[in-house]
Each structure stands twice: as structure tokens, then as C-alpha cells.
């Protein structure tokens, strides 16, 4: 019985709770049991007492016959980048390993206000810098998928704990963050749905900053409808975030009609499929044919400056990171290493407690912001970013949504030696939408020859999450998802 509860989607569990097929406490206990047996290293902090208390509140509402939100009583995990009041929040870095916030992030508070149940905090790449979830002070996360080779694989990153937990049936949904693809890429590698809304739709207040002009909260779930429900719960204006959008938030779930007749889908000619990959080409062709059969129109578009998106992203993100992470010095909070002078204390605290990838990106950022090189790198990157945005604006005059691969590769082995450049390249299809602040979603679309998930990415126009989700739902319905191949449902 408990195993069957774990297989339910958020909306299925919601219907069962309303029908009193089981209680929120029973559902939560099933997930707590699964988390206790976690072999993926997905959770870094667990909160079973808080979870059961939240479940009991939902059961109380049901017993009194009061209406409940679709997220009420639903067990979820929270990426360890979001501050949770009274619960350790580390960004998976030694420099914050004992930090306990005194306040709650806006997006997690919105989840709790909807009645969601927090199972705990999820592993991630340190300070969200990475695409493999191997850069964590708590150790790497394992992908639930093994493929034909049967070896331990990375779940992607930086929200690797979130994607692995959802795919591994350790939570019904999860909060993640997406700076350059950190929700969509791990969702693709783990065979789940990962969505980021338009920049500003979700408050960044209480989310530990990596690159402030790019950071955006997102969600990971098993179905597109579940992602829509979670997005509705966390989106909305917040006066505590100066970049928060005041655009009204529509009913994302209600916008999913699966009618794509006349919808113009743009295919960027610059987004080439990987060569010598017949399985990816076949998956792509099958989905294009299905969309045409459903009445959609396929339009070739050009995004000429996306060729430069990846280097532009790493210049800008690293520059912002070097500024944002300057605050971690061991003085007011976080880990401190004593030295004979204050300068020595700063040096020891930061050099011994930041991981190698974080230090690499901070050094890149310090270099690109330095007086002798800022104009050549940072200022030029900002100008190219404007050109990338202009490309998308021109494209959306011709199309309603844009379709692309989420990532050019499947999950790689945890022990597989990859250079930093190889890892950066996994974000090549996700970074452009982040630079432009556009909503985007990754949808599982089939299995590769290695029996690993492949995914498509739908990019929507600004504040058109409904159109994006509707097209994604059609793609998901065609593939049927992929988790049934992993769990037998």
C-alpha cells in the first residue's frame, strides 16, 4: 500500500485525499519511510516532525469538510538554496554548513501557505554552481536511472537532489532554482518535468543568490499538470523583491487544454541535433510529426546570437557570483577559520570552505570585473545579452512557442572524467532562455539506446506560461512520460 501511494501524481493524491481514500498523515508517513531508505543521497536534512504536523493540519481541514488547495497535504522537498526558518540551510557549502535561517523564503512560505508538507532539504551543487551535483559538501547525488551499463550516473545539476528525489519517488514534487538550466537540465537527465517561469514571476527573497539577474525559482514534478499546480502555488508579486513582477498570475492548470491547433512552434536553425545520434533524431522526428498531426504549425526561426549565449552566460554569472559571494567571510554567520590577522582569517575561511568549482567561478568573475578587463569581457557580454533578447523578441513575432532539445547528452557516470568545459556544454540549449528571462520547461520525451531519459524543451514568450505548459502537456501525453520504465507504472 505504501509503495502505491508513492506512485501517485500530485493531482491523483489530491483527489484521493478529498475522497478520503487515505489520510495526509498516511501519505506523508509513506514518503518519510522512503526518505529514510534513501540511497541516492538526495536529502541533506530531513524534517519528519514538521512534515507530520503539516499533514495533520490538512487532515483537520478534511475532517471539518473545508476545501483544500491541490498542494495541501502533498509531501515535497526543498532545494537547500531556499532559506527555511529554523531548518538548516547550507547551499551545500562548508561555509554555511551550520547556518539556520531566522526567516522563510517567499516561495517556500507560499508552498506552506498552500498546505504542502516539507519532507526536508535537498542536495545540490554548491551555491548552485554546477551541472552534475558532484560539487556538494555532502557528496554527489546518484541518478535513479542506471541505463544499460548499470553504473552510478549523475542526476544533472544544480538541482540534482530535487530531480533525483522526484524521479526516485522520495517526494511528490520539489523546489529547485534555475540560473542557466539548473531545473531543466537535471529534470531531463532524470526523466521528470522541470519548469522555470518568466524571470520575476517568483520572488527571489530568501533564495541564496548565485547570479541575481538570472536566478529564478522553479519546480520539478512528475507530470506537466503537477508542475502547473506547483507554479501556481509559488508565483506572485512580492514587495520584498525589487525584481518581482506585478503581472497577474493566471490559472496555469486551467490553461492546459491540449489543443494546439494553429499554434506556431518555432524551431531555431542554430540548435542543431547532436551528430551520429539516431535515437535523438528519431525522438525528435516522432514528436514533430505528432505535433503536426495535432494541428500545430512548424516554423523555422533564427536566433543568430545564441551562438554566443554560453560564453556570455558564464562571464555574467561568474561576475555576479564573485560579488554575491563576497559576503561570506565568517564574521556574522557561517563557518569561520581563525587567523592571526583579520586578513588571514578572511583568506583561510574562504579558501578552506569554498569548493573548487565555486572558487573557479569567483576567480573568473573577479577577473572579468577587474578594471583592466571589465570593458573587454563584462560590458561586451552585457551588450551581447541584449542581442540575444532581441533575437527572441523578433522570433516571438512569428511564433507562439519555441521547441528545442533540453540537453545534448544523457546522464554521465559519476566517476566519468569530464572537464569543466564539457560540463558547461550540457547547458548549451538551456542558457539562452535564462539570459532572456523567458519561461521554459523540460518534458521527458523518450528513452535513448542506453535506456536513459531524453527530453524536449519548450520556451514560451514572456508571461505566457499557459501556452508553454499546454504545448508541454501535448508532448508529455505523446511520450507517456518515462518513469513507468523505471518504476513499473
Curated annotation (Swiss-Prot):
Enzyme class: ligase
Superkingdom to which the source organism belongs: Bacteria
Gene Ontology, cellular component aspect: glutamyl-tRNA(Gln) amidotransferase complex
UniProt similarity note: Belongs to the amidase family. GatA subfamily.
Function of the protein: Allows the formation of correctly charged Gln-tRNA(Gln) through the transamidation of misacylated Glu-tRNA(Gln) in organisms which lack glutaminyl-tRNA synthetase. The reaction takes place in the presence of glutamine and ATP through an activated gamma-phospho-Glu-tRNA(Gln).
HAMAP family per UniProt: GatA (MF_00120)
Official protein name in the record: Glutamyl-tRNA(Gln) amidotransferase subunit A
Species, as recorded: Anaplasma marginale (strain Florida)
Gene name, Swiss-Prot/TrEMBL: gatA
Amino acid at each position: 500500500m505504501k509503495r502505491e501511494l508513492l506512485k501517485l501524481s500530485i493531482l491523483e493524491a489530491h483527489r484521493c485525499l478529498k475522497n478520503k481514500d487515505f489520510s495526509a498523515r498516511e501519505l506523508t508517513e509513506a514518503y518519510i519511510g522512503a526518505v529514510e531508505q534513501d540511497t541516492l543521497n538526495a536529502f541533506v536534512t530531513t524534517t519528519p516532525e514538521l512534515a507530520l504536523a503539516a499533514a495533520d493540519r490538512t487532515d483537520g481541514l478534511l475532517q471539518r469538510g473545508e476545501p483544500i488547495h491541490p498542494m495541501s497535504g502533498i509531501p515535497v522537498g526543498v532545494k537547500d538554496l531556499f532559506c527555511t526558518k529554523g531548518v538548516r540551510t547550507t547551499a551545500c557549502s562548508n561555509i554555511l554548513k551550520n547556518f539556520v535561517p531566522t526567516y522563510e523564503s517567499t516561495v517556500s512560505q507560499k508552498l506552506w501557505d498552500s498546505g504542502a508538507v516539507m519532507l526536508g532539504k535537498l542536495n545540490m551543487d554548491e551555491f548552485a554552481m554546477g551541472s552534475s551535483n558532484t560539487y556538494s559538501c555532502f557528496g554527489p547525488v546518484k541518478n535513479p536511472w542506471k541505463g544499460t551499463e548499470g553504473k552510478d550516473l549523475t542526476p544533472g545539476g544544480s538541482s540534482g537532489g530535487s530531480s533525483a528525489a522526484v524521479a526516485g519517488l522520495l517526494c511528490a514534487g520539489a523546489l529547485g532554482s534555475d540560473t542557466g538550466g539548473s531545473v531543466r537540465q537535471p529534470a531531463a537527465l532524470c526523466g521528470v518535468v522541470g519548469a522555470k517561469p518568466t524571470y520575476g514571476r517568483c520572488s527571489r527573497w530568501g533564495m541564496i543568490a548565485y547570479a541575481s539577474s538570472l536566478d529564478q525559482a522553479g519546480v520539478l514534478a512528475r507530470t506537466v499538470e503537477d508542475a502547473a499546480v506547483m507554479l501556481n502555488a509559488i508565483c506572485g508579486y512580492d514587495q520584498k523583491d525589487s525584481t518581482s513582477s506585478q503581472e497577474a498570475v493566471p490559472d496555469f492548470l486551467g490553461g492546459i487544454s491540449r489543443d494546439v491547433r494553429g499554434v506556431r512552434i518555432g524551431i531555431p536553425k542554430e540548435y542543431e541535433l547532436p551528430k551520429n545520434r539516431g535515437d535523438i533524431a528519431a525522438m525528435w522526428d516522432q514528436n514533430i510529426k505528432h505535433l503536426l498531426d495535432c494541428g500545430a504549425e512548424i516554423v523555422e526561426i533564427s536566433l543568430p546570437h545564441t551562438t554566443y549565449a554560453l560564453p556570455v552566460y558564464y562571464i555574467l554569472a561568474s561576475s555576479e557570483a564573485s560579488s554575491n559571494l563576497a559576503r561570506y567571510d565568517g564574521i556574522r554567520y557561517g563557518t569561520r577559520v581563525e587567523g592571526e590577522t583579520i586578513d588571514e582569517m578572511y583568506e583561510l575561511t574562504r579558501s578552506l570552505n569554498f569548493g573548487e568549482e565555486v572558487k573557479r567561478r569567483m576567480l573568473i568573475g573577479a577577473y572579468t570585473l577587474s578594471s583592466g578587463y571589465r570593458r573587454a569581457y563584462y560590458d561586451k557580454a552585457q551588450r551581447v545579452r541584449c542581442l540575444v533578447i532581441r533575437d527572441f523578441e523578433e522570433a516571438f513575432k512569428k511564433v507562439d512557442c519555441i521547441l528545442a532539445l533540453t540537453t545534448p547528452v544523457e546522464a554521465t557516470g559519476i566517476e566519468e572524467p569530464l572537464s569543466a568545459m564539457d560540463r558547461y556544454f550540457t547547458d548549451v540549449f538551456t542558457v539562452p532562455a535564462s539570459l532572456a528571462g523567458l519561461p521554459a520547461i523540460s518534458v521527458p520525451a523518450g528513452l535513448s539506446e542506453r535506456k536513459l531519459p531524453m527530453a524536449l524543451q519548450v520556451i514560451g514568450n514572456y508571461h505566457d506560461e499557459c501556452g508553454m505548459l499546454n504545448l508541454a502537456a501535448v508532448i508529455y501525453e505523446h511520450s507517456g512520460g518515462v518513469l513507468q520504465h523505471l518504476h513499473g507504472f
